[in-house]
Curated annotation (Swiss-Prot):
Primary location: cytoplasm
Residues the record lists as Phosphoserine modifications: 304
GO biological process, any: gene expression
Described function: May play a role as a negative regulatory factor in CD4-dependent T-cell activation.
Protein name in the entry: Maspardin
GO molecular-function terms, A-Z: CD4 receptor binding
Keywords (A to Z) from UniProt: Cytoplasm, Phosphoprotein
CC annotations in GO: cytosol; trans-Golgi network transport vesicle
Record has Phosphoprotein as a keyword: yes
UniProt source species: Mus musculus (Mouse)
Family recorded in the similarity comment: Belongs to the AB hydrolase superfamily.
Known partners and oligomeric status: Interacts with CD4. Interacts with ALDH16A1.
């Protein structure tokens, strides 16, 4: 139990990358927690947004690998926001505080939905240069819980945790997936009642993405084809919404492929970001591009990637 938490990689990450806390709202209780790693000279970094159960450190394997290649990577943890507009306004203020005009977003599950909503929210003055959507959805009604969304704030923490755990894989899984689930359960335990209630509210509050507002943004849809909380219908809906998106398919990986299939996920992220090399929206230090590109081409041979 808890193999990831005691792994050398995780401990190295925790000891070398500081967790920063930033307040951008008038309400001092709304605190963004984030890891910001890689060259500060990069002005269009890749930002990771976690799922309901996740904290910023669930992306530690992406941070370690991608910064090793010369990328600037930021992983976030949300403050307590109760609606999508409030989240988008807070996230915009955070980007202003970090002096980042445009960013690439990697969103997992709820993080993927919020990434799309933020791109939609800023479409008149775009802040999102590209999207990587991992196990993401475009309409909260798929969870059939829009009617309970307004009552999560009343529920005790143990009940909220039970709701989240109900979406975790319960069948047989391989050891790496089991470790990923254990780690996410541990992260879930670290979240307080208001953090969980607000995330579940954002996850289930009646809302959908308006694709015409973000159709010009390059998108990669990353899907897992074994057990995950998303139905086949929800995945098909994403393909319809983004007909020109690249598709990155993982045969296995469950709800948390960034933990248990990190090498594949990292490679797909690199392939996605490759298209921006040599532009002002590159997320990588230009001096290391050629070696990194070579490595990506090698790894690409063994992956399932569909161009639109």
């Amino acid at each position: 139990m808890g193999e990831i938490k005691v792994s050398p990689d995780y401990n190295w990450f925790r000891s070398t990358v500081p967790l920063k806390k930033i307040i951008v709202d008038d309400d001092d209780s709304k605190i963004w927690s984030l890891y910001d790693a890689g060259p500060r000279s990069i002005r269009c970094p890749l930002i990771f947004l976690p799922p309901v159960s996740g904290t910023a450190d669930v992306f530690f394997q992406q941070i370690l690998a991608l910064t090793g290649w010369g990328y600037r990577v930021i992983a976030l943890q949300y403050p307590v926001y109760w609606d999508h507009l409030e989240f988008c306004d807070g996230f915009r203020k955070l980007l202003d505080h970090l002096q980042l005009d445009k960013v690439h977003l990697f969103g997992a599950s709820l993080g993927g939905f919020l990434a799309q909503k933020f791109a939609e929210y800023t479409h008149k003055s775009p802040r999102v240069h590209s999207l990587i959507l991992c196990n993401a959805f475009s309409d909260t009604s798929i969870f059939n819980q829009t009617w309970t969304a307004n009552s999560f704030w009343l529920m005790p923490a143990f009940m909220l945790k039970k709701i989240v755990l109900g979406n975790f894989s319960s069948g047989p899984v391989d050891p790496m997936m089991a470790d990923a689930i254990d780690f996410m359960v541990d992260r879930l335990e670290s979240l307080g009642q208001s953090e969980l209630a607000s995330r579940l509210t954002l996850n289930c509050q009646n809302s959908y993405v308006e694709p015409h507002k973000i159709r010009d943004i390059p998108v990669t849809i990353m899907d897992v084809f074994d057990q995950s909380a998303l139905s086949t219908e929800a995945k098909e809906e994403m393909y319809k919404l983004y007909p020109n998106a690249r598709r990155a398919h993982l045969k296995t990986g469950g709800n948390f492929p960034y933990l248990c299939r990190s090498a594949e996920v990292n490679l797909y992220v690199q392939i996605h970001l490759l298209q921006f090399h040599g532009t002002k929206y590159a997320a990588i230090d230009p001096s290391v591009v050629s070696a990194e590109e070579l490595e990506v081409q090698k790894g690409r041979l063994g992956l399932s990637q569909e161009e639109p």
